[in-house]
UniProtKB/Swiss-Prot annotation:
Protein name as catalogued: Large-conductance mechanosensitive channel
UniProtKB keywords: Cell inner membrane, Cell membrane, Ion channel, Ion transport, Membrane, Transmembrane, Transmembrane helix, Transport
Membrane-protein topology: Multi-pass membrane protein
InterPro entries named among the record's database cross-references: Mechanosensitive_channel_CS, MS_channel, MSC/AndL, MscL_channel
Subunit record text: Homopentamer.
Localization terms from the record: Cell inner membrane
HAMAP family in the cross-refs: MscL
Pfam families, sorted: MscL
Purpose of the protein: Channel that opens in response to stretch forces in the membrane lipid bilayer. May participate in the regulation of osmotic pressure changes within the cell.
Transmembrane regions listed in the UniProt entry: 25-45, 98-118
Family stated for the protein in its record: Belongs to the MscL family.
Length: 155
């Protein structure tokens, strides 16, 4: 019985080794790491460039300050009662819809950039359309029909 379990474990380890050795798993790992780094770049772009411009265009609106408080502020709270970050740190239950707007903009930017990347990759690997083949002449059936008609005409 112990010998069978050992054999199963060794078999599973062999399968796992084959699975890991395939390029797909390594490609996925690289993609996850690059995706994490790319996400940080997009977050920085959104928070440091895009949202301040949107705030400026909307009259100085700071979207991080848009929230709804759901519970009371603790009596010993000494921070800014209009600061989402400070209230959140104090444990006040809130809905931060301004932060949600920022994250939604992040998502749209990431989705659009991924769309552009996929479109460019697809264009690179796109096979050029082959020109339609020139007609190669009559088919076998058409030739036989011509021969038949010629024989009928002769008599």
């Amino acid at each position: 019985m112990a010998h069978e379990v050992k054999g199963e474990i060794l078999g599973m380890l062999g399968e796992f080794k084959k699975f890991i050795a395939r390029g797909n798993v390594l490609d996925l790992a690289v993609g996850v790491i690059i995706g994490g780094a790319f996400g940080k770049i997009v977050t920085s772009l959104t928070e440091s460039v895009i949202m301040p411009v949107v705030g400026w265009l909307t009259g100085g609106v700071d979207f991080t300050r848009y929230f709804v408080r759901l519970g009371p502020v603790p009596a010993d709270f000494k921070g800014d009662p209009t600061s989402y970050a400070e209230l959140k740190a104090a444990g006040v239950p809130m809905i931060g819809y301004g932060d949600f707007i920022t994250q939604a903009v992040n998502f749209v930017i990431v989705a659009f950039i991924i769309f552009l990347i996929v479109k460019a990759v697809n264009r690179m690997f796109e096979k050029p359309e082959e020109a339609p083949a020139a007609p190669s002449g009559p088919t076998e059936v058409e030739l036989l029909a011509e021969i038949r008609d010629a024989l009928k005409a002769k008599g």
